[in-house]
Amino acid sequence: MKTPTRVSFEKKIHTPPSGDRDAERSPPKKFLRGLSGKVFRKTPEFKKQQMPTFGYIEESQFTPNLGLMMSKRGNIPKPLNLSKPISPPPSLKKTAGSVASGFSKTGQLSALQSPVNITSSNKYNIKATNLTTSLLRESISDSTTMCDTLSDINLTVMDEDYRIDGDSYYEEDSPTFMISLERNIKKCNSQFSPKRYIGEKCLICEESISSTFTGEKVVESTCSHTSHYNCYLMLFETLYFQGKFPECKICGEVSKPKDKDIVPEMVSKLLTGAGAHDDGPSSNMQQQWIDLKTARSFTGEFPQFTPQEQLIRTADISCDGFRTPRLSNSNQFEAVSYLDSPFLNSPFVNKMATTDPFDLSDDEKLDCDDEIDESAAEVWFSKTGGEHVMVSVKFQEMRTSDDLGVLQDVNHVDHEELEEREKEWKKKIDQYIETNVDKDSEFGSLILFDKLMYSDDGEQWVDNNLVILFSKFLVLFDFEEMKILGKIPRDQFYQVIKFNEDVLLCSLKSTNIPEIYLRFNENCEKWLLPKWKYCLENSSLETLPLSEIVSTVKELSHVNIIGALGAPPDVISAQSHDSRLPWKRLHSDTPLKLIVCLNLSHADGELYRKRVLKSVHQILDGLNTDDLLGIVVVGRDGSGVVGPFGTFIGMINKNWDGWTTFLDNLEVVNPNVFRDEKQQYKVTLQTCERLASTSAYVDTDDHIATGYAKQILVLNGSDVVDIEHDQKLKKAFDQLSYHWRYEISQRRMTPLNASIKQFLEELHTKRYLDVTLRLPQATFEQVYLGDMAAGEQKTRLIMDEHPHSSLIEIEYFDLVKQQRIHQTLEVPNL
């Protein structure tokens, strides 16, 4: 804004009366006598003194009278506060058109549409402005006589130094000038000011703050320490549902962000599924919730859909507004009671929903100890030549069988008789269904059925029913009332989504019932949910093997359904372990969490670098899409400083598009970085521990925590390091093994591709995870064996030389059964 320039005119100045000029008027005494005494104060000191000449004045007479000066001073403004940056207002130009163009044909003034023009005006091909005319227009528009009438005239005022050729451009002409100005001012006054955190380290990953990636933000904590935004987000994700904040590794205090806007931002990312591990360009479409291979529309194209966590369903809207959305990790929240709402009407479902909790009676609940007739593991003691006691564990080989093999009974009948018996049992099943369920023979052939719960909103569940899938319909059948609750044509299914580990979400084409939830018992077989998902998605499927028709035999044992089928319960409940079945094929390999350790300090230079890159590429080729890889590099830190330091990246899957860039930037440093191989190995293990703790957010859920085989692979350019006689190395080794549950192995880099390929294949066969032994009444020692495959044997030394008991406890997680097994075995005495 600028002060308008007025046309020069004669200035009339008022001159106060003078005593010499107006002697006939009243003297000054009368003038002063009429004023208040508070206006003028007498100054006796000056009255007594005669004004001396300049030559005889002493220096002391120039001392000012402070009291007199302060009494005559006005209000003093506050001094400027220069502690904060001063942002002057933008120099916006007030725009208006010419005076002539401001009047219409009727003589009326046109109204000014906007007092400030922040849009870029086209100044090309405009003649130079006449300065005299512009000044005249400004003086007219701002004059007192025309202020009210001409204040809205649209005048275009151009600066005289504006270049007509268009090379010059004013910043305030940008349409985003006000937005960017507000953002810049906020940035100067906020926590995200462009600071330089020199010498500070992240309180989580202990990397220097200067080692951040492009676009990384820094979080200042209440404990006066700093951390990377993504590092804090990963730990915050693990503790959010517990109502806790991370603890600072430096001072041990609870670390909360100083900026109050950071916590709501992180909570928003967690609730929308955009956590720390989803940021950046590493998003892999194959790892999303929806299986894109089978989530096609009926036209064969990929449908455009809203992420499940952001869907607004009709059941979420009530007279109270929106309900709390049910998230994929909703089992972390308390159940909230809402007003009972009726289940949506026909044509599919015609019964009111009940809210009975999904709970089996005591005799129906699965007990791992009772369910396993014989242990899959064999344990025994032995002694070495030095009289040291060893304990050995071996898991039995897996017995493979085809789909007909599970039908074999004790008489071992031939395949022809098996086929005949299967046809007979299938016929009885069809007769039972036709008599009790499909009386009009409209549903088609039977595919499978199980005892499941269903819901239309994911909150209120209907129990005591069978979900039966036919070739034409999905039928909801109440086996207590022996009546059909609802039927859904198979061509009405649009998408089938894995909502969480226990729930399937079926999106329908109907506007009456847009979706339906199917809930599985948490103790059911691992393959039950993928099997139902596969069968619902493949509309052309018409039959399954007899052993796959029903899986929830335990839940249906108290109902007369199994007996009416005419088949022995143990035969019907026998589940095939054939990995060729479609819903088992993708889950045959154990997912891995693999940490690969690389030493960049070597004398061979570029030759050694090529060997390292070749080994890493071989590992990437051998990993599956659901495996997670982390790389630890020693010889420099995260900012590139060469020294006895280490840095890491991960855990990320093999399809991350940043692996190529990361590997291309690896450079070999001088060979004298570490004193010896033990120091190098110690730094390697310490960096691995930092990576393991940073990626621990993946282990928050039990299904995920026990679903990975964890392995640390140290690629040595020379001999393998011995840690038995170094206590510091052994302590770091035990921390990774017992606390973070990682197995550690050292291998020399070889040019043979088969070596690494075979190593990864062995890791993918680890079925029994987190195997742990305890010796009750003998010692409090706990022996950790790690992950084991079927047929694998491991032996460990125990400290107790004379065990006092023949009993030993073994605990492990069976990946195939998705159950944690805890057993007490009797071991033969030595």
Swiss-Prot record:
In what way is this protein post-translationally modified? Thought to be phosphorylated by MAP kinase FUS3. Thought to enhance the binding of FAR1 to G1-specific cyclin-dependent kinase (CDK) complexes.
> Between which residues do disulfide bridges form?
none
Q: Which UniProt keywords apply?
A: Cell cycle, Cell division, Metal-binding, Phosphoprotein, Protein kinase inhibitor, Zinc, Zinc-finger
Q: Which GO terms describe its cellular component?
A: Cdc24p-Far1p-Gbetagamma complex; cell cortex; cytoplasm; mating projection tip; nucleus
- Region annotation (Disordered) maps to 1-31
Report RING-type zinc finger ranges.
Answer: 202-252
* Variant or mutagenesis effect after changing S87P: In FAR1-22P; induces cell cycle arrest in the absence of alpha-factor
Q: Does the keyword Acetylation apply?
A: no
Where is this chain compositionally biased, Basic and acidic residues type?
8-27
Query: What triggers or suppresses the expression of this protein?
Result: By alpha-factor in a cells.
What this protein is called in its record is Cyclin-dependent kinase inhibitor FAR1
Q: Name the gene.
A: FAR1
